[in-house]
Design a protein with these regions (language model features):
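Flexible, low-complexity junctional segments that flank or bridge functional domains
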Residues: 1-186
Length: 186
């Protein structure tokens, strides 16, 4: 993802290019974990920078363009270029909220919460999640209807298919750190 990785990261990834099929055969997922660790590091760096940017008011009077889809663009080559990209992204996010009639304090609150939530989700991913993502990426190249279920997902699937789930009968939603009851299930 060109919002996280830089050109200098590509040689690091290339050393694993010919090993990915070996990972599938051997079950040694260390190369995948190495790649994920770099992703987690880059996400932490960029999102920390984005949150820190909110300490200062953003100038909406500049005439700049933000390109979210960067697939056709070259990889950024330096931390400074990555910070510039994130400045543009945060400015774009803040501008969208401003256009939705949020005041500056509201913008800070929403964006801080958003960026921290992304970081929290990335940091909550465990080795099973990383393996599941990798294996699903592989299986979908062969068949879009095939997927790998991690042990946790497999257990949830078994419960759903057996219709034997026993619990409090409520549909729950995680809202920030609080659990909210959406509805009671008869």
């Amino acid at each position: 993802n060109k919002h996280y990785f830089r050109a200098s990261d590509i040689p690091y990834f290339n050393r694993y290019r010919d090993l990915l099929d070996d990972v599938l055969r051997s079950g040694d997922f260390n190369p995948i974990f190495d790649i994920f660790r770099l992703y987690r590091l880059r996400a932490q760096q960029n999102l920390d920078y984005a949150i820190a940017m909110l300490d200062e008011p953003i100038d909406f009077t500049t005439n700049k363009e933000y390109l979210f889809n960067r697939t056709e663009l070259p990889w950024l080559s330096s931390p400074e270029e990555m910070q510039q990209l994130w400045r543009e992204r945060v400015t774009n996010d803040a501008l969208n909220l401003s256009l939705a009639d949020k005041d500056w304090d509201g913008i800070i609150k929403v964006l801080t919460k958003r960026y921290k939530r992304v970081l929290k989700r990335i940091n909550q991913l465990d080795s099973d999640d990383v393996v599941e993502t990798f294996l699903n990426s592989f299986t979908r190249t062969l068949d879009p209807h095939s997927s790998y279920l991690s042990p946790r997902q497999s257990e949830e699937y078994k419960i759903q298919m057996s219709l034997s789930y026993q619990g409090i009968g409520a549909s729950l939603k995680l809202d920030d750190e609080l659990v909210a009851v959406l509805n009671i299930i008869p």
